[in-house]
A protein has these predicted regions:
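Catalytic palm subdomain of template-directed nucleic-acid polymerases
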Residues: 60-79, 155
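Alpha-helical interaction/regulatory segments in DNA maintenance proteins
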Residues: 24, 29-36, 160-185
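Long, highly charged, low-complexity intrinsically disordered interaction regions
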Residues: 73-138
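Residues that scaffold, gate, or flank divalent-cation-dependent active/transport sites
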Residues: 1-56, 60
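Short secondary-structure capping/junction motifs at helix and strand boundaries
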Residues: 21-24, 47-54, 71-75, 83-92
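Polar interaction faces of repeat-based domains
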Residues: 152
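A short alpha->loop->secondary-structure connector
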Residues: 109-117, 156-159, 179-181
Length: 185
């Protein structure tokens, strides 16, 4: 039906009624327990010191000490184990920065070609640029729909457009956070 996560109920109430969608309230105790199990499972593959729990449903792993590891294989193993042990469907994004990793995760979710794992570290520059040209700038971590409208007005429509923009100029127009985001792409 195209209902995005975290959309307020009142915004989709009519659509829900039209399609007879079942709605359930959140069970945060269960989510917290599943999050704990999720992160414990990840510790079967990487050191706890390399894990940063970002939110109840998001974790970053620092991969610098795993340079001799096939990261695609590791990600697929983690993904398969989380499904087998916890029945949690996950996608994995691998990048040079948290911003790039979140973008890679978005790509993995939206493109079945990647089989749930998008590794931007080993993607050649031409492929990466081609991919970024087809992703709306609103998908970049920290940009969102409101800021994307302002970027669109500046002819910055895609992730690629943002990545090649002048970080200093964008800092002057927006903020230091925008500059940092650009430098992380």
């Amino acid at each position: 039906l195209g209902i995005k996560m975290a959309v307020p109920f009142y915004q989709v109430q009519e659509l829900i009624q039209q399609h007879d969608v079942a709605v359930f309230s959140s069970n945060y105790a269960l989510y917290a327990e599943m999050s704990r199990r999720f992160n414990n499972t990840i510790q079967q593959f990487v050191s706890a010191k390399d894990i940063e729990i970002y939110s109840i449903d998001e974790t970053f792993i620092e991969l610098n000490s795993y340079s001799q590891t096939d990261l695609n294989e590791l990600a697929q193993e983690i993904k398969a184990t989380l499904w087998q042990w916890l029945a949690l469907p996950v996608c994995v994004g691998i990048g040079h920065s948290k911003t790039e990793a979140k973008l890679a995760n978005h790509i993995a979710k939206k493109n079945s070609y990647f089989n749930g794992v998008c590794n931007l570290l080993h993607m050649d520059l031409c492929s990466k640029e081609a991919l970024f040209q087809h992703i709306d700038v609103a998908e970049v971590w920290g940009v969102g729909r409101k800021l994307a409208k302002k970027l669109h007005a500046l002819k910055i429509h895609s992730v690629f457009d943002l990545a090649i923009s002048d970080p200093e100029q964008m800092q002057r127009k927006f903020s230091i956070l925008m500059k940092k985001t650009i430098l992380e792409l």
